[in-house]
Every structure is written in structure tokens, then in C-alpha cells.
């Protein structure tokens, strides 16, 4: 079974006025100078999954300037035994829309037909910056295993915004809180359980794997207030904590307060204390473990988006990465400034050269 794009078209997306790629399922090596528009192609592929893509941008910001006419992406997705035509677009700053096989669909529906994971340069500081980035990284992996995680997360965020609004307005009437806290407890408990399941799946995929990259021990750490085990316990904790939350002006218990702890397993060293090279290797290892797990769980490895990853690995690690990607059968989209970075891939990949002329990107398959 496979998961890959067989075609991709960009219209007025970022620096690309028009780009069309025909694809055969092999990894895609995209090369060209810095600023040419390589990452914009990876961002386009990331939008074949729910959410705001690898840059977390608004739909309006993705439109080509100065026209700002809106943008459109179209792709043909081979997903296991099915072929889907997928379109996603935004009209002049409007919210992103999705069609699957010609029918309007919610973004969350993309999670049922595609799995997309990425590593981008801003994630290099994942282990040493704030918990929000680590939660986002964990939730992206969780979403790859459990497509409904996107919807339950949206529902949780909506309920929390509403409760926080009550707290900031110093509303004390318990009737205003009861329904919101039940919804927070139901969705929050589901988020917590989903994350734990994803971590279990990742641990199993790392155990005994033949890989050149170091295994990571991952632990989900609750916030200072802990994380109750059941829906009823979380609901009660939210109710009991109202006065505390009123003083803070926000909700202080729930999965939005959690953190992801990582350690270099063989050394027993916290990821935050590892060298930058080791931290990068741990991230690559986790992405590959996620891909191995999905090959078993979903039936095919995910689409992998690796932006400037090759440049930060030595030649041996680079070759090992390519070997693992090809052994998995994953369609990995990789960027680099020169073709030499992909020498050890050889004819196992398709190559696309991206150039820029006065702010207009051109993508040329070789």
C-alpha cells in the first residue's frame, strides 16, 4: 500500500504564480538557491492535511503578492487503494476551503485520507524553547495516528476560549460554567488519551528498529495542576479551580498545560541538554519512527516534508536517512541548496529545480 501525490499544481501560491509537477511516488528532491521558493512547495503539500500548514500562516498570507487574488492548490492523491482528487483554496483572504473528489469537505476530512509530517528549521530549537512548540509537535504526530484528534482539539480550544472569556469578565455564576466545563472535560480527556496512545505507538516503533538515528524516550508531563485521569475528575477539577482561574484570568488545568519531555535514550541525557546535532538527530529519529508506525497502523508511511534537513547531517547520516526513507517507501519532499546534498539518493528520487526571477518562482522538473 502507498500514500503519495501523483500530481501537484500551485496557482498564485506564495512566490509561485503557476507550478505543475507530475510525480511517480519516489522521494522528491527540490534544490535551488535560498529564497527561490523551495519551502513554498513543501508548505503547499502540508496543506493536504488539516490545519494551517508548516508555517502556521493565515490563508491570506499564502496568497501571491502583489496580486492578492487568493490561491489554489490541486493534487491527485494515491491513498492506499483509493485515488482522490483534492483541491484547497482561499478566495482573496477568505478562510481556506477544501474539496475532495469534487465535493466540499471539512479540513479534518483530509486527515482521513492523508498523513503528513514535517521537519523545518524553526523546529531545531524545539527542545530548548517553550512547551507550546512541543505540544504542537506531539499533536501533529498524534493526528497522524488518530485523525479525529484535529476535531476534538478544535472543540477543546473553542470551549476554553469561551471559559477564559467568562473568567476575564469576572463572571461568578456557576450556571455559565457548567456546560463549558463538561465539554472541556470530555474533549480534554480525549486529547490526553490520544497523546498517550501516540507516544505508546512511537515507543513501539523505536523498539528494536534498525536505524542510524538515536532513539528518544518521550514522556507526557502534565502541567503544575496535574491531569486528572477521568472525564468526571477533570470536570470536578475545573469546577473546584474556578476561583483560582478567576484570579489568573485563564484556565490553569487541562491538556493545554502539558509538556513533552524528551531524552536521548542510550545516554539518558535530556534532549534539551544534548548538542544541536544530537537534538536534530533525535527529531529525525522521531519522524522516521512515526513513519514506521504509520506504515503498520495506517497501511502506508506518511508524506514527509524535510526542509533543509540534509544540510545539517554529515554524509553518512544523510545516506542513512535516504536509505531509511526509500526502505519505507515514503514520498519524502526534501529541500537543499545544491544537488550534491542528494548525491547518495541517485535515481531513487525525482528532482525539481526551483529558481527565482524578480520574486516569481519557477519549478522545473529534471
Residue map of PLM features:
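Conserved lysine of the Walker
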Residues: 38
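Nucleotide-state sensing region of NTPase/ATPase domains
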Residues: 46-133, 139-149, 200, 204, ...
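Long, charged N-terminal accessory/stalk domains
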Residues: 125-126, 132-178
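H-loop/switch region of ABC-family ATPase nucleotide-binding domains
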Residues: 335-337
Amino acid at each position: 500500500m502507498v500514500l503519495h501525490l501523483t500530481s501537484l499544481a500551485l496557482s498564485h501560491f506564495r512566490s509561485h504564480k503557476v507550478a505543475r509537477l507530475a510525480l511517480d511516488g519516489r522521494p522528491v528532491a527540490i534544490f535551488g538557491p535560498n529564497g527561490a521558493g523551495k519551502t513554498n512547495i513543501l508548505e503547499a503539500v502540508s496543506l493536504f492535511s488539516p490545519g494551517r500548514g508548516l508555517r502556521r500562516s493565515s490563508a491570506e498570507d499564502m496568497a501571491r503578492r502583489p496580486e492578492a487574488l487568493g490561491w489554489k492548490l490541486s493534487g491527485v492523491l494515491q491513498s492506499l487503494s483509493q485515488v482522490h482528487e483534492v483541491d484547497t483554496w482561499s478566495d482573496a483572504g477568505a478562510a481556506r476551503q477544501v474539496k475532495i473528489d469534487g465535493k466540499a469537505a471539512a479540513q479534518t476530512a483530509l486527515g482521513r485520507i492523508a498523513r503528513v509530517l514535517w521537519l523545518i528549521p524553526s523546529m531545531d530549537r524545539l527542545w530548548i524553547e517553550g512547551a507550546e512548540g512541543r505540544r504542537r509537535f506531539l499533536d501533529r504526530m498524534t493526528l497522524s495516528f488518530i485523525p479525529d484528534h484535529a476535531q476534538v482539539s478544535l472543540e477543546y480550544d473553542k470551549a476554553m476560549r469561551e471559559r477564559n472569556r467568562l473568567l476575564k469578565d469576572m463572571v461568578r455564576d456557576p450556571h455559565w460554567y457548567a456546560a463549558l466545563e463538561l465539554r472541556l472535560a470530555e474533549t480534554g480527556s480525549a486529547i490526553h488519551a490520544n497523546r498517550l496512545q501516540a507516544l505508546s505507538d512511537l515507543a513501539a516503533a523505536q523498539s528494536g528498529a534498525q536505524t542510524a538515528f538515536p532513539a528518544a524516550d518521550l514522556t507526557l508531563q502534565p502541567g503544575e495542576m496535574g491531569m486528572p485521569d477521568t472525564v468526571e475528575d477533570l470536570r470536578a477539577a475545573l469546577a473546584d479551580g474556578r476561583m483560582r482561574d478567576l484570579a489568573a484570568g485563564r484556565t490553569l488545568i487541562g491538556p493545554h498545560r502539558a509538556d513533552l519531555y524528551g531524552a536521548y535514550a542510550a545516554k539518558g541525557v535530556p534532549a534539551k541538554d544534548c548538542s544541536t546535532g544530537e537534538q536534530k538527530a533525535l527529531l529525525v529519529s522521531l519522524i522516521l519512527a512515526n513513519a514506521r508506525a504509520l506504515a503498520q497502523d495506517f497501511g502506508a508511511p506518511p508524506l514527509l516534508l524535510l526542509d533543509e534537513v540534509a544540510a545539517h547531517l554529515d554524509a553518512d547520516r544523510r545516506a542513512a536517512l535516504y536509505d531509511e526513507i526509500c526502505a519505507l517507501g515514503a514520498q519524502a519532499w526534501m529541500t537543499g541548496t545544491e544537488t550534491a546534498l542528494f548525491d547518495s539518493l541517485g535515481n531513487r528520487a525525482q528532482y525539481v529545480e526551483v529558481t527565482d526571477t524578480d520574486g516569481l518562482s519557477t519549478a522545473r522538473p529534471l
